[in-house]
């Protein structure tokens, strides 16, 4: 019942949310089955509500904690029109497990089970090769990069720049490591410069992930036009208390966001036209 509690909180706070529960065999087959059913029920419930503010996915932990039996159960119970959320090749152990137990690489196993597709979100993708990238591209599957989580867990650095260059829809996330997207933005910018030993890396790719990739990912699950200030689009706005010494203009906006702004400077938040926080005071909840 945890998904319904989270959905209730999302409704009360007015936050647009796409939810799923992490399926795995770590707590036994019964819990795995319950997890599959809770995801399926929440997906159907969100469709019935049809508010444009709540959506659902079939959540999975990672292939090394999900047996073929549970994969089959999830595939059989997933409602049409939605995809999966799964951690992929976050650690080298995930790859070693898949090769040892299934004789194939992780993305190949997911492909065989029909997991890939335009509504599926793959987290991390650190230990994948060119063939697997081809499969992700061919199936129009989405990827989310979580730089702080990968660094904090000492997992490694994913080939995110190559994913973007290949035209794979790639977004920027947190994996729950932080709730401040400006932190992920800053860390992603320097991580790939360091990893590639190239000071010119990531200047264009990271803004593309945050401001274009994330919007397109969200629009695959929500009906509204998102991420723009224009008539007909969802009124999602933040107001930032930012008064820089250096003038801000259309040519240097990204640098101001990257080097000057933080989440702590957000003073007002509007979601779907509803003011949620005004002058750092929560409006809709106690």
Language model regions located:
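Divalent metal-coordination and catalytic microenvironments
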Residues: 10, 58, 87, 122, ...
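C-terminal cap of metal-dependent C-N hydrolases
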Residues: 234-283
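Short, acidic/turn-prone active-site loops that include or flank metal/cofactor-
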Residues: 22-25, 90, 147-152, 175-177
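Metal-coordinating catalytic core of metallo-dependent amide/deamination hydrolases
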Residues: 3-126
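Glycine-enriched alpha-helix->loop->beta-strand junction motifs that scaffold or abut catalytic
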Residues: 14-16, 77-83, 115-118, 135-144, ...
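Alpha-helical segments flanking ligand/cofactor-binding loops in enzyme cores
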Residues: 8, 72, 108, 133-134, ...
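His/Asp/Glu-enriched, well-ordered alpha-helical/loop segment
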Residues: 112-115, 119, 161-244, 258-262
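Histidine/acidic-residue-rich catalytic or RNA/ligand-binding cores of hydrolases
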Residues: 92-104, 132-137, 154-163, 178-196
């Amino acid at each position: 019942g945890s998904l319904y509690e989270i959905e209730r909180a999302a409704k009360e706070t007015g936050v647009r949310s796409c939810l799923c529960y992490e399926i795995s065999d770590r707590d036994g087959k019964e819990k795995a089955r319950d997890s599959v059913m809770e995801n399926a029920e929440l997906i159907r419930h969100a469709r019935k509500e049809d508010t444009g503010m709540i959506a659902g996915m079939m959540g999975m932990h990672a292939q090394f904690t999900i047996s073929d039996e549970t994969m089959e159960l999830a595939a059989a119970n997933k409602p049409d029109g939605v995809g999966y959320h799964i951690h992929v090749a976050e650690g080298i152990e995930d790859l070693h497990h898949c090769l040892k137990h299934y004789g194939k690489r992780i993305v190949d196993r997911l492909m065989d089970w029909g997991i890939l597709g335009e509504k599926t979100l793959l987290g991390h993708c650190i230990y994948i090769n060119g063939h697997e990238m081809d499969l992700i591209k061919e199936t129009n599957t989405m990827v989310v990069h979580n730089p702080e989580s990968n660094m904090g867990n000492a997992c490694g650095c994913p080939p995110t720049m190559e994913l973007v260059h290949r035209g794979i829809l790639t977004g920027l996330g947190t994996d729950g490591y932080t709730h401040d997207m400006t932190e992920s933005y800053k860390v992603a910018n320097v991580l790939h410069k360091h990893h590639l030993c190239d000071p010119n890396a990531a200047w264009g790719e990271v803004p593309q992930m945050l401001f274009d990739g994330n919007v397109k990912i969200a629009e695959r699950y929500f009906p509204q036009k998102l991420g723009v200030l224009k008539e007909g689009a969802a009124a999602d706005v933040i107001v930032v208390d930012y008064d820089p010494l250096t003038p801000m203009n259309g040519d240097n906006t990204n640098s101001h966001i990257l080097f000057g702004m933080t989440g702590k400077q957000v003073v007002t938040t509007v979601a779907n036209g509803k003011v949620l926080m005004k002058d750092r005071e929560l409006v809709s909840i106690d």
